[in-house]
């Protein structure tokens, strides 16, 4: 992992695939959250696998653990992994039911992440 990408304790988790637009609860449709708590070891999550595991545990505690979650983090080096390639195609919806972005282009082009929309898995 790049140090810059992991310098903050809170990071973003994404569901690895799009959401169903059916009539489900907001928590059931959540496909994006900012982590509510770190690992207790700063930015050391033990690589992407550890960061994904952390996201999965938080999602499970929030009632959304039946799906696969990925941390929005990249690696560097010869076998680099780009964060945007790990999160599926969208759309992404927060725990309050707000659509953050409909696709990867919108996620990276529009500024729809702010204090009101970048909420934790608990909706806080």
Predicted features, each with a name:
Residues 21-124:
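Secreted/extracellular ectodomain signature
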Residues 1-2:
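N-terminal secretory signal peptides that target proteins for export/translocation
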Residues 5-16:
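Bacterial N-terminal signal peptides
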């Amino acid at each position: 992992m790049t140090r810059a990408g992991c310098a903050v304790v809170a990071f973003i988790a994404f569901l690895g695939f799009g959401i169903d637009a059916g009539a489900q609860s907001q928590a059931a449709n959540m496909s994006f959250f900012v982590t509510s708590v770190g690992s207790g070891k700063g930015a050391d999550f033990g690589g992407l696998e550890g960061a994904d595991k952390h996201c999965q545990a938080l999602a499970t505690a929030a009632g959304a653990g039946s799906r696969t979650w990925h941390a929005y983090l990249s690696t560097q080096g010869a076998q680099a992994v780009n964060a945007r390639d790990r999160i599926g195609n969208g759309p992404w919806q927060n725990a309050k039911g707000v659509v953050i972005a409909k696709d990867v282009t919108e996620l990276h082009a529009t500024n729809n992440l702010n204090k009101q929309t970048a909420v934790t898995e608990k909706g806080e």
